[in-house]
Amino acid sequence: MAEHAPRRCCLGWDFSTQQVKVVAVDAELNVFYEESVHFDRDLPEFGTQGGVHVHKDGLTVTSPVLMWVQALDIILEKMKASGFDFSQVLALSGAGQQHGSIYWKAGAQQALTSLSPDLRLHQQLQDCFSISDCPVWMDSSTTAQCRQLEAAVGGAQALSCLTGSRAYERFTGNQIAKIYQQNPEAYSHTERISLVSSFAASLFLGSYSPIDYSDGSGMNLLQIQDKVWSQACLGACAPHLEEKLSPPVPSCSVVGAISSYYVQRYGFPPGCKVVAFTGDNPASLAGMRLEEGDIAVSLGTSDTLFLWLQEPMPALEGHIFCNPVDSQHYMALLCFKNGSLMREKIRNESVSRSWSDFSKALQSTEMGNGGNLGFYFDVMEITPEIIGRHRFNTENHKVAAFPGDVEVRALIEGQFMAKRIHAEGLGYRVMSKTKILATGGASHNREILQVLADVFDAPVYVIDTANSACVGSAYRAFHGLAGGTDVPFSEVVKLAPNPRLAATPSPGASQVYEALLPQYAKLEQRILSQTRGPPE
């Protein structure tokens, strides 16, 4: 789209699993430009499906690093062809799919610092990587390395207290350990290891960008309290790892000015600042403008909770990261697998496949459901690890079935009580100023949101998050420009469009759920102990 009056702006990038996307946001925080490149469609020569290669073992999942480089070439050329005015860009930042790692070959820094504006990036960087297909977040091939890492630091809980999460197969430290063990030659030829986020930032900087605290928290390597690499974790993964990673930086740091390559080839101003890139989940927290005490609930195929925490309590479930917009605070992520598909199943079975009847069932049943509680996990749940359907009546006796309308309320109340219990297990507390931001498919259903407001005893707002990682990256660019750690993020984004109020707690809700929540938690423990057998 051609530009008319010049608009000073910041760019927000997102290097996600299936595409690279960019938005331009002006000083009034309006998104006025967006563009994207879809890997499968626009770069078919790499042969990806959903942006990745799934290997024969079904566990190893990688993406070609040059595909990401070429996607950046294409998107910049598209912007140039559309008449985008690069001279107005004050700063840029971005997001990357979390946990993925890129291995720069010895000598790559030299190539990055001496890019010729006459050639595209991928023509100049094709020999710069010691691993051409990089492990990404969908990879689950590192179980052995996870066990080694946990053993090295005294167990899963000890690792979680140190790094914010127990060992997960997709987390970067375990992926690095696998590469060192299986491909020691490639590892020894690697001079720098980047996350997808810091790799993308390096392309814009024309030199290696540091890893930021927030995305660095998804590696099982960063001590989240001290914001330094854990020597015990580094040593358990691979030798000489600290020098290949370099020290991490606060997420709002200006890491440098844009490379002269972009000034000469595209017309960026030489003073355009690059603000540290971060992970896509932390960038989404920025895009949704979460503040202290807030919680975001994404109600999709799986349900995800984003929490803003002051005093985290790392556990064997969920993930705690350094907060991307306030380095003194934290954020947590909790994933629940049984989301919208479970809601659809119960709708189909209980209320004749109709969402309006589903809503009527919620309206016609009382808060607390007369003490009837249910757990609905048709696929093995992550939080907690339970499968199956479990229903309990007022006396806490297991029952085989509920009437249709009771079943609907038991499902929705149960899903939200589980979210509150597990959030509080990580140190989250509902505050008087707490807002809940709801996104995803079920956020269009007013009655579902009413139950959410009642269970958490907090107002629920709905927000459009189609580009939340991109928009959050542009907001973070403005934040870095304004002085980062010295200026509250909320001050920088106060002009952004406000979310819409969708539900407020019903009178008496807090008393009902204060009584039910401990009961629900006890029943969850009961099911867990029955499915696991007695503790060892």
Curated annotation (Swiss-Prot):
**Record-annotated residues binding ATP?**
355, 441-442, 445
For the keyword Transferase, the answer is yes
One GO term (biological process): xylulose catabolic process
Q: Which GO terms describe its molecular function?
A: ATP binding; D-xylulokinase activity
State its Enzyme Commission number(s).
2.7.1.17
Q: Which GO terms describe its cellular component?
A: cytosol
| UniProt KW keywords | ATP-binding, Carbohydrate metabolism, Kinase, Nucleotide-binding, Transferase, Xylose metabolism
Q: Where does substrate bind?
A: 99, 170, 280-281
EC main group: transferase
Q: Which reaction does it catalyse?
A: D-xylulose + ATP = D-xylulose 5-phosphate + ADP + H(+)
The source's domain of life comes to: Eukaryota
How the protein assembles, per its UniProt entry? Answer: Monomer.
Query: Its function?
Result: Phosphorylates D-xylulose to produce D-xylulose 5-phosphate, a molecule that may play an important role in the regulation of glucose metabolism and lipogenesis.
Which family does the record claim for this protein? Belongs to the FGGY kinase family.
This protein is called what? Answer: Xylulose kinase
Question: Lineage of the native species?
Answer: Eukaryota, Metazoa, Chordata, Craniata, Vertebrata
Name the gene that codes for it.
XYLB
